[in-house]
Each structure stands twice: as structure tokens, then as C-alpha cells.
Amino acid sequence: MARLFVISGPSGAGKGTLIRGVLEQRPDIAQVATSATTRPMRPGEEEGREYFFLSTDAFLAKVDEDDFVEWVEFAGNHYGTLKSEVDRLLGQGANVILELEVDGSLVIKEARPDACLIFIDTDLAELRRRLISRQTEGLDEIDRRLQIAEEQSKDKLRFDHVVHNDRVERAVAELLSTLERELDR
């Protein structure tokens, strides 16, 4: 039976990097469901790969039509997981990975108790360094995201697993091992 995995953690914790690392080693283990967002596209991103980029009006219309499994407003933008995307992948028999913010992850757990939630954790100094090196936000926004991250880390005990991302290679191995153990259950 196909499984739903939710990978979450603060902005800059390395969720996407770790997911890519796992899929490079085991491309057969799962497929990533593409989320929708109203945030601007970053350099190197493509429509339908990292996100479905929607206008605020289009996003809110989908909210009104109950098209999302979950959606949240975070840092002034909307993020959501389309039901159609998750159902399409699960219907194909694929294990599905969702990369979500913490609040969205907890909504998924309520709606789908069989989902496996994995929190990607890192210390705040490392998080600050990563956010600065990403060069996509100003210092005020980075400070705001760090405050949010501190709050979000309080919820990590509500997750099924916590992976500490101190070194990417080690954290990729831990995340892959966690997914494999869950699939063997």
C-alpha cells in the first residue's frame, strides 16, 4: 500500500536538499507531490517542479472550491497541497512525499492519521547562516523567519520522527533510513 510522508521543518532547515539527496540515492522510494504557492518564483525554479505558482486570487478560489488537502499562510504567502496531486500519485501506487511548513503538516496528520510526519531540525545559528547564504530574503525577513523557526521547533515532538540536519550527508542517510524503516512496517 502506498504511503504518505510529510517532511517538515523551519524555512532553511534543508527539507528540499534532504529530499533531493534521498531521491538521488533511491529514486524508486517515493515521488514528491508538488505544492501550490503564491510566493514569487526564485531563480532556478520551474512552474510545476518546485511549486505550482498561483496568483493570490487563483489560490483563494481553489481554497473556496475545497481543492486543498491543507493550506496555510506563512510569511505573507499562501502554500497548499492540492488534493488532486496527492490522489493522482497515490492512485498510481507511488509513495508520496509532501514538503510542508509545520502548520500544514499537523493539518495533514489530523486529516490522514496514517501519514508519517518527519521533522527536519537544525540549530538556529546554522539556520541563520543558511538563510543568509540563500540570498532570497533581507535581514529583517530572516530574523522574522528565525523567530517563526523557534516557535515551530516546539512542535517537533508532535511528529513521528525528527532528523537533525547538522551535516547534509549524514542527515540524508538518516532520512532515507527512516523512510525505509517506515515502508518495512
Language-model regions: role of each:
Residues 13:
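ATP-binding Walker
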Residues 28-41:
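Short beta-strand-centered segment that lines the nucleotide-binding/catalytic pocket of NTP-utilizing
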